[in-house]
Structures are given as structure tokens and as C-alpha cells.
Amino acid sequence: MTPYEKNFKVPGRFEDHECTFITWPCKDSDLEIFNYENEIVIFAEKLSKFEKVVVIADPSNFDKAFKKCKNFALIWSIPTDFSWIRDNGPIFIKNDKAEVAGVHFKFNGWGNKFEKCES
């Protein structure tokens, strides 16, 4: 039986959710977001007043993320080289029985436009 047949759906972004994931800026990312660590800290801290925040940090950046965010967020050490969690993070689905599952998509870098994106 497929998730669809079990009435699983991707919830709307406006629906209640358990927490928010944020990726700590990555040095090797092709984006300049590495320059915005302080903004990520401010955002995560403010958001934590309303919901649980999980900061995902590459092991090479874990100590820095932990030091700056430990008082208001959970910090998870997970290998990553991309700062935009929306493009490479988990997608959760739920059904009317309140069951939650994760979906594993093979992210191809927007149609293999970028060599680095082969997850």
C-alpha cells in the first residue's frame, strides 16, 4: 500500500508543525550565506520563542553552531555542504491518524544544472 493510499499528504506550510530545521551556514556552499552566521543566530533565537528550532551543522562547523545556539536550539551534527535546508532537507507527510513519515526524494540540483548536487 502506498502512502497516498494510506491518506498521507504533505501538510501546508501554514499548518501546525513540531519544529523548524535551519542549516548552519556551510563554508563550502556555493552561496555567500557563510557570511551571515550572525543573522542565522538572531533568526533562530527569535523563532525559538514560538517553536522548537533544530540547527543542523556539518561536523566541521558543529562546535561553532553549538556555542552560538545551544541556549535556544537543538544542534544536530549531520554532514552537509549546502545551506538551504528547503532544497535538501526532509519532507514530512502525515495522515488523518496523526501518523508522520518522511519522504526521501533524490534531489538533482534543479534538473542537474549544478554538478555538486548529486544527493
Regions found by a protein language model. Give the residues of each.
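The feature marks the mature, well-folded catalytic cores of soluble enzymes
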Residues: 1-119
